[in-house]
């Protein structure tokens, strides 16, 4: 099954400047189940508000556990993590 993971931050001015960015990136890159990742922006298209991932996994619980172990979450940078099952119909990247 595929899952969308939305990780929201209260104040996240520059993920690349965050000291744990390398650890966060390596954590998600090492996952064989991460299909896509992206930064999340506010409606203004400029203000960074978090991250978005599409993952393949056996269960919702597996994705939640993986997301909770993200170095950014362990450092309390994420205010809220939301995981939803998705059914991709069209991809035009």
Q: What spans do the regions from the language model cover?
A:
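Conserved, structured core segments of small domains
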Residues: 1-93
């Amino acid at each position: 099954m595929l899952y969308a993971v939305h990780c929201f931050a209260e104040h996240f001015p520059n993920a690349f400047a965050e000291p744990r960015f390398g650890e966060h990136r390596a954590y998600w890159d090492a996952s064989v189940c991460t299909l896509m990742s992206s930064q999340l922006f506010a409606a203004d298209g400029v203000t960074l508000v978090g991250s978005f991932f599409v993952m393949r996994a056996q269960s919702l619980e597996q994705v939640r556990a993986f997301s909770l172990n993200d170095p950014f979450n362990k450092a309390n940078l994420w205010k809220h993590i939301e995981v939803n099952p998705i059914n991709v119909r069209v991809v035009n990247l």
